Amino acid sequence: MRNMLFFPALLLSGCALTPNSTPLQQDANWTVGQLPNGMKYHIYPTDDQEISLRFTVNIGSFQENEQQKGYAHFVEHMAFNGSQHFSGNEVIKLFAQAGGSFGADINAFTAYQQTTYKLELNDASHLQQALTWMRDVSDGIEFDPQEVEKEKGVILGEWRRSRPEDKSFSFNAYYASIDGTVYEKHDPIGDQESIENATAESLKSFYQTWYQPQYSELIITGNVGVEEIAAIIDEKFANWQTTANNTVEKRRDIPVKTEPRVLFSSVMESPSVHFAIDRGFVGMRTQAQQHQMWHDDVSAKLIQQRLYSVLNDAAEPFQYVYANAFANNYSRLIAGGVSFAPSQRHDMHRLFVETLASLRDYGVSQQELDSVMSGYRSELTNLESDWQQRKPFHFADSRMIDLDQNNVTQSKQDYQANLTQFIALNSLETANKQLQGVLDQPVPFVMGLGQGDRMATWATTPMKIAEAYQRPGVKPLTLAAKDEGFLQPQQAGQIVDIQDHEGGFKVYSLSNGIEVWFQPDSKAGDRAYINFASLGGKAAIDPSLYPAYELATYTAVRSGLGDFSGTELDSYLRKNDLMLNPILGTTYHGVEMIGAKEKLAITLNALYNLATEINIDPRQLQAVKKEFEQNRSAYLKSGVGQLVLKGNQSSYPDHTRHRLVTADEVSPVTIEQIDAIHQTLFGQNRGFKMVLIADLTPEQVAPLLRQYVASIELQPAPALDYAVVYKDNLPAYSMVKEGSEKSTLHLVRVLNPHVAAKVGKDMFIEDMLQRISLARVLTQLREEASLDYSPAVYPMMQDQETVSDWFFESQIAPKDAKLMDQQIDQVIAELAENITQEEVDTAAKQLSVDLRAMDSDPRFRNGFYTRYLINHYGIDALLNYEQTAQSVTLEEVKQRAKVTFGPGTKRMTLLLEPK
């Protein structure tokens, strides 16, 4: 998907259809002002309840000298550790009680040329306090020496996580792109020495020098009145005095490098080959610039589409294939690549280059272009629903990006007209000319090494690939796409009952036992959102099929449906802008589909074929086997993989569904086994539910349900046992000394194998317990003990499993392993015995705020509905989510905490130590 919003068509008048330097039109709903001290503010009122705030100081690591590396980032951290009106971490606690979550709603980031503070408010009740804190950030941060020393551990934890020793290919590619530039010399996080040597005085000096009103901007969107909030801004910020006036120049003119390279990959990655093409600088202020951005996006998508079809037609295994148009700092790039097993290197290099050369010399077909442009047309058609779903944080983030990149924040009407014009102008001739313009130049190729590869061995390979690219391309034998390929039901089924249900549902009981929950909703726009799912998943199949289960989804997708091959299916789905996402879980299975409402017949026909007409190609099965073997082998050779395998095999007996499948186990998998899995999952009814949300009427939906859903033949299914089988003697402690990092991965697993079955309210209780647990972990391990930047806690059990299985995860300095053990022991013990009403109230508020997205987001809502329906959790709990959350009592949470962390639980500690 393009990371921008596209708007539906307006009829153009008889004006010229040629993009030019006409300026883009600003969104007039923005009010921009400037205080006498130089601080700018940007206000965007909406009808939403929420309010989003962004406070940006256009200062970052570029302002640091050699002795100040990482100071801008360190100052950002200190804003959450005490200021004029907020002591310690009080600001985090305050906004959490209002429904915000640290990280998602309360956060900040530091870049090369800006530092931005973010607050998301549930309503206007805490707006004054939010602005008070942001005013504190401007010149009221307190640099308590003890807090500075504590925060060093947190920042070093962030440094360990974000600057790994075992660097991924993408990490190395980024640093290669800034090699020798000013970016390389100013890493925002700094270095370990600078972080450790920072003092309260040195940080305060940097802060007082650079945090100045003339460098700062405040963005407020959502539930505010322009005049009222402008007056409050003036009241809060007008007295912020300028104390320094150093020159700050926004640098958007520093190009990144696109050069032939050979780069290392991480231990879990496979070899790869890539290209990267410079497309100039960011900055979108004219129609022509916007059209060029779209042209680049189309070119990238055409490249990816062709690469995928070539690889799939050849039944070549691959780890990934991509082509994207994106921004790297202030440079626009088009990049693409493919990853593969070491044994395929020669063939994949050849296919990659030949495909690009063919595109350069012969372009694409009309069918290929139509497949890509369908996404633009769909976004255009869905203007109103997409625009209505935009929340205050969308407007705030978009404005922040536009200010940073010097873009015009475009009006809806202008965007709509310009996109309409682009679609009209982007003919096959134009698209191929643009594609040729991208590829008809010296293309820098980049090679990603595999494990054991030596840099010197492959040093000249990128140049050899470039030489091969200069040869004439080969014209494809056929570029035709198949317009029909889905098989039709021989006989329609029946609707045997229709019931109305709270929430605006029509509930259809079909003759084959499927239950369809249809919710008409204008917010869905011109899209139809569908989930078709059932209990079962891996728990439903014979243990002998577990290896085949790992391959089933990708094999089916690559093979195709009905009379479509995999490549033909991909083209057909793109052309019809239909998303089809099969899901095979541990205890459930199904498919998610999103398509145009006027093409609901096509979408449901696709569902019918997925349920009845998969067509496994033996070549694709072999390709997927090789893909799995390469991926799983690389993973299990890594330190993390070895730790996970050790923990898994020490917990679960052989031939149980949670036992990890290794690479050598998939070799014997047959087509018959894939077919058997499909028949078990989609040929038997374990309570299939279909949830459909669309702006349609029951009269439009019912005939299609009879034709395509009620016609799916289903057999009765035997009852399933979802019990989780564990080994008798679980080890309390496991360690692997194969880590690639200088840090220790610290995992604590808390397991209770005997827990009662759950209902809908239990899911709310569990979610709230996780929020409480995470808040405790962040307070104890991050803020108090300074052991890790981002410790985590999360449940791992699946729906229907009557167990409790939680993990505490952190990445720490090896010397702190014993201290972390003590801290985790304390956290777990206190969770089991002492939870407060305040914590329950805060978690309930946060959960209610997060679930509010169901009101405006049909896809988000559909996922929740489906989960609750197939698991019999009771959909009423969701329909009244705020009431359900508020009804959770302290005693209920304490009881769940005791079951989860208290007496009777088993504990396992797993450590990955450096080699």
Predicted regions and their residues:
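Gram-negative bacterial Sec-dependent N-terminal signal peptides
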Residues: 1-17
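Proteolytic maturation boundary segments
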Residues: 15-40, 225-266, 271-280, 284-285, ...
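M16 family metallopeptidases and their MPP-like homologs
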Residues: 44, 49-61, 71-72, 89-137, ...
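Active-site recognition of the HExxH zinc-binding catalytic motif
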Residues: 69-77, 81, 301, 546-554, ...
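Long, His/Glu/Asp-enriched segments that create or flank divalent metal/ion-associated functional microenvironments
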Residues: 296, 779
